[in-house]
């Protein structure tokens, strides 16, 4: 398997899992996009395994979305690393 195929297989698993925030709210079958955790590096994407499945509302569209207000999102749902730990447990 190539790195590219491993990466796409991982992304497929994330999308199939659905939005991690919607799951926490009791809505298990939501559509998900890939959110790359940037680990504080401006303009740099994280390793493909450092990604979260988020629906458009929790990723970039809503007033509680990560990209609208990272601080508000983190206060309500936890850090990206905490969410990543939860996602990784669910993928096992």
What are these regions (language model features)?
Residues 28-31, 38, 69:
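Acidic/histidine-enriched, beta-strand-rich ligand/metal-binding domains
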């Amino acid at each position: 398997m190539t790195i590219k195929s491993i990466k796409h297989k991982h992304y497929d698993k994330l999308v199939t899992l659905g939005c991690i925030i919607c799951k926490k709210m009791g809505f298990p079958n939501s559509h998900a996009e890939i959110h790359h955790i940037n680990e504080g590096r401006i303009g740099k994407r994280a390793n493909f395994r450092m990604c979260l499945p988020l629906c458009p509302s929790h990723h970039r569209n809503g007033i509680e979305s990560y990209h609208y207000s990272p601080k508000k999102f983190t206060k309500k749902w936890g850090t990206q690393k905490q969410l990543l730990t939860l996602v990784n447990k669910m993928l096992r």
